[in-house]
Amino acid sequence: MFKRVILIVLDSVGVGELPDAYKFGDEGSNTLGHVTEKTGVELPNMGRLGLGNIIPLKSVPENPNAICGYGKMAEKSAGKDTTTGHWEIAGLFIEKPFPTYPHGFPDEIIKEFEKRIGRKVLGNKPASGTEIIKELGEEHVKTGYPIVYTSADSVFQVAAHENVIPLEELYRICEIAREILKGDHAVGRVIARPFTGTPGNFVRTGNRRDFSLKPFEPTILDMLKEDGYEVFAIGKIEDIFAGQGITGKNHTTNNDEGITATIKAMDEIKNGLIFTNLVDFDMLYGHRNDVEGYAKALKHFDNRLPEIMEKLTKEDLLIITADHGCDPTTESTDHSREYVPLLVYSPLMKHGVNLGVRSTYADIAATIAETFRVGPTKHGTSFLKELPL
């Protein structure tokens, strides 16, 4: 039926707290609801699909003539980070949360890291990425010591000025950290966070790189690759899956590049999965509590969505979702435990349909598996037969 699936993750665009959000300190979080409420941003193209039918949105009205399948999905895994969310979308459950470090990393980890890289480190504490380079950037430039920090997520982040520690050296340092952080200290991701500028004017660049754990079981990506389908990763998708199950990649660094790369891939890849992560919502605006910036990023995606839609054929299935929340209207600058939106469209569809509340993100993996007749996946329930085709 379908020869191609285009799967787009709007990073952090959650649609309301999950029932267990209180366990994560995220009561009341509603990323999309609060951003539309505070800014009044209009999203007519996603509204046409049925975005306003998923939850009440102040500036995106419910659409009785929605053209796609719409609903929301709960995260079944224990977590609210990028790796957990994307792995569940691909069919894996994380039953034990990745370790977090609210007081910084233990001495044995830091000492081993310093020994292996031949440098001391600065920081070693939870911090906002923009704030810690303000605080320690000048000392880093003087000493050449990389800045190590973490957050509420399972991440070991290494910040360095590109003129002090060149990118390839920073990436090598992060690969060493990835080798060290295993067993009980197997954090979800090691992240390179390069920056440039001068004291008082440091700015992070787009040359971020994620070094994820390898998935511990086959994902839908592996199943597709093994059956000879293309799996093309855009944005940080290849990093999130540590290259596993990927046949091609484009490491875009922002939403605009990611959308353009998706459109280009649709011209070139005719059989398989195009899997895109659009990171700006989370990286630039959610974590920085920038409500207006978040709204502008939503508007930008909505404005460019027709470019993707017009390239769809009757052999295509488009799925738009998210991996977690990151509500910029709350005091927290961390991810939030939320439902994520589900928008599913093909030109073959006769009309829109309410896909309801799905119990796991893995329903996407199950649907892709049924579409390409691979699998079945270990988790998830396909919604393919619920679409009015």
Curated annotation (Swiss-Prot):
Annotated residues for binding of Mn(2+) 1: D11, D323, H324
Reactions mediated catalytically: 2-deoxy-alpha-D-ribose 1-phosphate = 2-deoxy-D-ribose 5-phosphate; alpha-D-ribose 1-phosphate = D-ribose 5-phosphate
GO biological processes: 2-deoxyribose 1-phosphate catabolic process; 5-phosphoribose 1-diphosphate biosynthetic process; metabolic compound salvage; nucleotide metabolic process
Swiss-Prot/TrEMBL keywords: Cytoplasm, Isomerase, Manganese, Metal-binding
Enzyme Commission no: 5.4.2.7
Binding site for Mn(2+) 2: D282, H287, H335
Localization: Cytoplasm
Coiled coil: none
Cofactor binding, per record: Binds 2 manganese ions.
Pathway where this protein functions: Carbohydrate degradation; 2-deoxy-D-ribose 1-phosphate degradation; D-glyceraldehyde 3-phosphate and acetaldehyde from 2-deoxy-alpha-D-ribose 1-phosphate: step 1/2
InterPro entries noted in UniProt: Alkaline_phosphatase_core_sf, DeoB, Metalloenzyme, Phosphopentomutase_DeoB_cap_sf
GO cellular component, one term: cytosol
Signal peptide: none
Superkingdom assignment: Bacteria
Pfam families in the cross-refs: Metalloenzyme
Principal location listed in the UniProt entry: cytoplasm
GO molecular function annotations of the record: magnesium ion binding; manganese ion binding; phosphopentomutase activity
Cofactor requirements of the protein: Mn(2+)
Function: Isomerase that catalyzes the conversion of deoxy-ribose 1-phosphate (dRib-1-P) and ribose 1-phosphate (Rib-1-P) to deoxy-ribose 5-phosphate (dRib-5-P) and ribose 5-phosphate (Rib-5-P), respectively.
Family as reported in the entry's similarity comment: Belongs to the phosphopentomutase family.
Name of this chain's protein: Phosphopentomutase
